[in-house]
Amino acid sequence: MSQATPTPPTALPDESLPPVQPPNAGFLVQLFVIPGLIVLVMVLVWTLIKWLPQMGNDAETNVKALEGSGANRWQAAVNLANLLRGDTTGELKRNEELAGRLAAKLHQEISDARTGEDAQLLRVYLATALGEFHVDAGLPVLVEAINTEELADRKPSLRAAAVRSVAVLSSNLKKVTGEPVTDSAAVAAVIEASRESDSLLRTTAAFALGEIGGSAADDRLRVLLDDFAHPYARYNAATALARRGEPAVVDVLAELLTTDEPPETSDKDTTDEQVAQRMRLVTSGLDAVLALAKANPSADLDSIILVLEKLTQDESREIRKRAQVVLRELQGRKSAA
């Protein structure tokens, strides 16, 4: 029986707002509520995985399936990414051989440059799976994918998926080794991606730079603070730098907190979807404020306190409650100073 091809994953704010705590490998599942940053409009919607047909629940079965010549091989890549993400023992995540096989397959698929939808989905989900590992065997091919030329209207984007996977991989590596991705080629590729005009790619790259860290990444994030043409990239830069304690982000965070309408929406977005996006933006901004206060106790947040006081009267109950918590925290810190 033929399988219906699901709508390709999209990116939203927060999930694009990958969260005030650095997002972990599972942040892709939530897209835009990603704990730690603000990844607006930039995350794969993993909810589609819940209904995708399963091709076997073990890694080897799925690897053989995607290495074969059958149709819908991308489903095997989805299954592998799902298995890796749910691997609580770490056995799969630490499997260098498995990572190497997936990396080799992605390299082959990039070289073949097939244009069919199945081939495109396979490349995207292979890249996604490689980000779930706790070993960096897939990093070189992710860099290759980021540097690959693709049609501007190609969706889902392999380049964006690869950038996103570098972010997740960096978060994973930092968790298990204490060090994020520092490979110069990877950092350079993500920085170049942050200069692209495509909003999703640029926004995703800004998020990834926050996960990578390092002086070169931070320098680029500071430039993106003035990227008014791409608000979500700008917000991701601000939330990343907030976690580093940079007071220069205060004005951008204040702007984020006073968002009435999401700056980047689609004509297809319903009113409810826009309200939800606005809530994710504001709550992510609130998390970033707390991160800044924690990282830099001496930062002048008086202008933020004024904004928070207004948010305690917001029509959204969730925003009101969260703003009250953050306001009390800042006022307490100020009193103790």
Short names for language-model regions:
Residues M1-V20:
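N-terminal intrinsically disordered, acidic low-complexity segments at the extreme N-terminus
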Residues P22-I38:
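N-terminal Sec-pathway targeting helices
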Residues V39-W46:
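Alpha-helical transmembrane segments
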Residues A59-V78:
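Short extracytoplasmic/periplasmic juxtamembrane "stem" segments immediately C-terminal to an N-terminal membrane anchor
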Residues D302-A337:
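Hydrophilic extracytoplasmic domains
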Residues L52-K64, T88-A113, V135-E149, N172-S194, ...:
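Amphipathic alpha-helical scaffolding segments comprising HEAT/armadillo-like alpha-solenoid repeats
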Residues L31-I34, W46-Q54, R73-E91, D118-V135, ...:
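Structural detector for internal amphipathic alpha-helices that build alpha-solenoid repeat scaffolds
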Residues L66-A71, A104, Q108-L121, T148-K155, ...:
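Short coil turns that connect the paired helices of HEAT/ARM alpha-solenoid repeats
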